[in-house]
């Protein structure tokens, strides 16, 4: 009670302080609001933001004071037309002035962006009272020269093939029906043409349901249909291939609901159905997938909760009535440390804590080691601010991992101390020390191991807040510098051991204006050869041709390492692929000429017509057999056999992660996972050789010997204490490995889909996207955490856990078949590389995804108490000021749990899981968020959350009572749709940008104007 009163006084003081700040003068001729964010407890360091408003109350200029590297101000400008509509949105400029007159701003802006004459985005509106956007120009003169995103507002028509739409429905028995085509004029159609003239259509009915999403490849349609029942429940999603072969089992997502509109049954294409059971509080209590149903015992997964709806236990049982035959997988404890009396916790390694700081938080977890009776025990300790200051976790090697964090005033880590012990092994203690600049940006990361402190990385920023350079091991010799274009897209990485140039609308390839990379060049390691690729794409932005060449013009030694996809099916499954490589000591040619045979989205056979093979065991597809069914799958869509690799069986655990790979010659690869999805061990038995690898947090053992300690920038070899660093490209691919002296130890060159076509040295296994490559026994799988990827085929081996976010695409495809511009950090979702700050991105753990934004958990050690790695620099430093309430909920596909995360980015607990589809997906942020802050919807900030079958989750804000939902079309800069509550449903109120600011005078269209209550469910 005493603590609560203290907190109340604190909030009152803050409110008065904020009021006082808003009355201070900045520019006497304009209205403004000043916000001061304190950076230290004494109030001597702070960041000021001043927002100026015109006479109509519209924000038109924002000044971030002294945030640049030169201690200047960063200023943005928003212009409006005579109708009050937002028009030119100017990129920020650097200025020493407290206020910049618009004319002066516009005259100086080009010099901040390489003298580009159009450093602003510009919407064009139609001449109607609806004020709908018909064109949107991105920043940059090149885009204003005819490369806009165009929007046309149409109606469906039976006389036009591109505007025709089949009228699917659901019978009273729940079956799919086809009722011809919709009559002309019954549907609203939005046609979108991107900067490269790629066309897509969205068809919406009078209820606001999206019934068809159509993408065009020339004149060929790729249609995804959404079919609803009379209660507006989404019952079927028909993939594009369904129009070629009407097979629901192979090409449809199917859903069934109970009388309370809860999804109780669903089926993904090519997989068995899943059942879900709820209690009277609408909580998921039982679920069963296809593999569980196929077991003799008929296993179910059960979920238990406490009185506050927090998940307390999850496991498997033999029926859905009682938890008989229980196998507990995970347990969670909250509020206190009474769990210390239980086995596993009742020892001195888990101290008591009587402070009460853990009240309302997760204080401990137990995760079973799958396939055994062993368990991992974890306890979390908090300070008075609710921050995790200590984590203690047992490990499978008979020891413990203890992490202690000291925070700055702004809740960023100042030091993190990690101690690792294991039975009979050397104790390892490491300390990370973080330093920040005057704008609270990360400036330096130091690492201490064995008492010796070194600098892992130094960071420098340009005046626009972008990372300008990074130096490794405290040496200017190991420095990488970064360059950007007017849109903030990375165009160059330059260093003595690795350089890369990326071209979009420039360079020697066909110019691309929609963000796709048209060509790139690079030079790696000690080589003098400049290598490169030119890229072409189809109308769906899928990679077609990657033409290899050398020199800056990519015009010599062409096609030596080209990789071309010559055909896709409508779901994006690769049908034919050609790959070139080295065939002899000085010869190059076609090494793969592949034809894929598919059964639905699943692969059944691959045939290679190439006569030559890769030289000296190089990367290629190995055509091991010639028979009808070379690949087989289980009821969950997991690959169980790959005869071309000589794999006779692959078995999986309850998380759809492999437990064993068995080869026809008796060789095996065994995997051990925790019930939270953490990989703990692999055992390779190849012939007479056995290699055991233990993953104990960031300490890697090989055959019982401590081998590597992974760091934020590379790793330490524990045999000699030497540091090694990764030099990464724009995707986070490890291109070069150098030692602490700057000597090149490894250089890698990649095909676009991830195969290593040439390398020098092979000192460590982390390669493409920074993922561990298992090449033993010719497996050649990359471990993405949630699933494995086969770069020779350009396919994942198992179904995408987030397949329901990508209805139009095969659940086995890699990165929407655009591997140059996207990556899949955990094997669960696709992220645009331009939306990720790769300079600080650790692909083993960093990803922002899901419920609103999801976080991955780095490893078994760092869950609760770990900062949820920033999607971009400065994210957590600003996001707290834009959340509706303290904290947000995030989901981790890697661990299958949902985590609670505070506005400081620290994971604080486990939240209940829900079982209604579709699963949430990745949220994307841009570089602009480093200077503007990201607004986010949260469950904690909402008094109520309801689900719409196609528009997603609606949140009722505690602060204003309005209902918010993410805008799926995002026309006119809109990121959110905002609704007012009425007796009959939700009525459109305003649109808002991604920062939660209302867009002035942006009028509604007839799409989504009103959402009746019957379309919404809990």
Question: Residue ranges of each PLM-predicted region?
Answer:
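Bacterial Sec-dependent N-terminal signal peptides
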Residues: 1-28
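A motif-centric feature for acidic-aromatic and gly/ser/thr-rich catalytic loops and repeats
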Residues: 236-238, 242, 255, 409, ...
């Amino acid at each position: 009670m005493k603590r609560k009163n203290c907190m109340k006084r604190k909030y009152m003081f803050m409110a008065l302080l904020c009021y006082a700040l808003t009355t201070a003068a900045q520019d006497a001729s304009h209205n403004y609001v000043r916000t001061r964010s304190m950076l230290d407890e004494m109030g001597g360091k702070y960041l000021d933001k001043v927002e100026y408003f015109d006479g109509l109350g519209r924000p038109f200029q924002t000044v971030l004071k002294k945030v640049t590297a030169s201690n200047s101000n960063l200023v943005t400008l928003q212009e409006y037309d005579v109708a009050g509509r937002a028009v030119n949105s100017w990129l920020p400029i650097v200025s020493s002035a407290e206020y910049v007159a618009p004319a002066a701003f516009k005259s100086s802006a080009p010099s901040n962006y390489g003298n580009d004459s159009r450093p602003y985005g510009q919407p064009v509106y139609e001449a109607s009272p609806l004020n709908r956007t018909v064109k949107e120009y991105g920043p940059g003169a090149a885009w204003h020269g005819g490369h806009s995103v165009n929007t046309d507002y149409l109606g469906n028509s039976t006389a036009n093939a591109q505007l025709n739409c089949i009228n699917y429905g659901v019978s009273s028995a729940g079956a799919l029906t086809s009722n011809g085509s919709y009559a002309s004029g019954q549907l609203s159609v939005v046609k979108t043409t991107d900067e490269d003239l790629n066309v897509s259509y969205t068809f919406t009915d009078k209820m606001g349901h999206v019934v068809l999403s159509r993408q065009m490849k020339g004149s060929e349609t790729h249609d995804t249909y959404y079919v609803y029942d009379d209660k507006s429940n989404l019952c079927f999603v028909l993939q594009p291939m369904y129009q070629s072969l009407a097979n629901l089992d192979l090409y449809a997502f199917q859903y069934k609901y109970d009388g309370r509109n809860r999804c109780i049954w669903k089926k993904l294409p090519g997989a068995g159905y899943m059942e879900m059971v709820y209690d009277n509080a609408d909580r998921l209590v039982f679920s069963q997938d296809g593999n569980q149903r196929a077991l003799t015992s008929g296993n179910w997964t059960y979920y238990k909760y406490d009185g506050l709806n927090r998940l307390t236990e999850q496991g498997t049982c033999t029926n859905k009535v009682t938890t008989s035959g229980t196998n507990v997988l995970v347990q969670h404890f909250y509020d206190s440390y009474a769990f210390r009396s239980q086995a596993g916790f009742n020892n001195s390694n888990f101290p008591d804590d009587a402070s009460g700081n853990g009240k309302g938080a997760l204080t401990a977890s137990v995760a079973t080691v799958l396939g055994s009776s062993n368990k991992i025990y974890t306890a979390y300790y908090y300070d008075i601010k609710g921050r995790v200051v200590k984590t203690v976790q047992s490990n499978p090697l008979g020891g413990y991992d203890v992490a202690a964090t000291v925070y700055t005033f702004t809740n960023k880590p100042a030091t993190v101390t990690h101690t690792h012990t294991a039975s009979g092994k050397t104790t390892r203690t490491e300390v990370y020390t973080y330093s920040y600049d005057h704008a609270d940006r990360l400036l330096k990361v130091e690492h201490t191991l064995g008492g010796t402190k070194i600098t892992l990385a130094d960071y420098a920023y340009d005046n626009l807040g972008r990372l300008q350079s990074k130096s490794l091991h405290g040496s200017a010799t190991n420095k990488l510098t970064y360059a950007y274009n007017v849109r903030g897209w990375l165009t160059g990485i330059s260093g003595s051991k690795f350089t890369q140039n990326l071209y979009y609308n420039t360079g020697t390839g066909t110019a691309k204006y929609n963000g796709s990379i048209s060509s790139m060049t690079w030079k790696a390691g000690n080589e003098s050869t400049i290598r490169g690729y030119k890229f072409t794409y189809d109308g769906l932005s899928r990679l077609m041709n990657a033409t290899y060449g050398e020199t800056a013009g990519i015009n010599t030694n062409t096609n030596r390492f080209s990789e071309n996809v010559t055909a896709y099916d409508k779901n994006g499954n690769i049908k034919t692929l050609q790959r070139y490589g080295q065939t002899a000591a000085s010869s190059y040619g076609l090494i793969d000429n592949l034809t894929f045979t598919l059964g639905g989205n699943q692969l059944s056979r691959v045939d290679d017509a190439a006569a030559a093979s890769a030289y000296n065991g190089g990367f290629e597809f190995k055509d091991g057999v010639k028979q009808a069914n070379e690949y087989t799958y289980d009821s969950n869509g997991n690959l169980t056999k790959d005869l071309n690799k000589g794999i006779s069986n692959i078995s999986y655990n309850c998380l759809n992660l492999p437990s064993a790979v068995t080869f026809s010659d008796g060789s095996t690869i065994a995997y051990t996972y925790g019930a939270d999805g953490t990989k703990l061990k692999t055992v390779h038995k190849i012939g007479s050789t056995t290699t055991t690898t233990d993953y104990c947090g960031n300490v890697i053992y090989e055959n019982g010997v401590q081998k590597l300690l992974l760091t934020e920038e590379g790793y330490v070899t524990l045999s000699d204490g030497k540091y090694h660093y990764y030099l990464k490209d724009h995707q986070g691919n490890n291109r070069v490995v150098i030692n602490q002296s700057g000597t090149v130890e490894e250089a890698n060159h990649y095909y676009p889909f991830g195969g290593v076509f040439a390398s020098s040295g092979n000192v460590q296994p982390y390669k493409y996207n920074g993922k561990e490559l298992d090449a033993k026994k010719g497996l050649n799988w990359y471990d993405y955490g949630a699933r494995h990827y086969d770069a020779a085929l350009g396919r994942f081996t198992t179904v995408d856990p987030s397949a329901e976010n990508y209805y139009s695409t095969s659940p086995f495809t890699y990165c929407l078949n655009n591997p140059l511009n996207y990556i899949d950090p955990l094997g669960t979702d696709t992220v645009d590389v331009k939306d990720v700050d790769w300079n600080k991105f650790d692909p083993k753990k960093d990803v922002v995804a899901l419920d609103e934004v999801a976080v991955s958990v780095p490893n078994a050690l760092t869950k609760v108490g770990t900062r949820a790695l920033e999607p971009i620099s400065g994210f957590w430093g600003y996001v707290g000021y834009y959340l509706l309430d303290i904290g947000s909920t995030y989901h981790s596909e890697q661990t299958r749990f949902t985590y609670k995360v505070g506005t400081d980015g620290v994971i604080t607990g486990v939240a209940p899981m829900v079982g209604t589809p579709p699963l949430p997906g990745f949220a994307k942020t841009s570089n602009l968020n480093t200077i503007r802050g990201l607004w986010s919807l949260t469950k904690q900030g909402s008094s109520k959350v309801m689900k719409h079958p196609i528009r997603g989750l609606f949140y009722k804000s505690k602060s204003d009572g309005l209902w918010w939902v993410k805008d799926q079309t995002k026309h006119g800069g809109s990121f959110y749709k905002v609704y007012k509550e009425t007796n009959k449903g939700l009525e459109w109120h305003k649109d808002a940008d991604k920062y939660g600011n209302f867009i002035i005078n942006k009028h509604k269209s007839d799409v989504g104007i009103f959402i009746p209550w019957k379309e919404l469910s809990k």
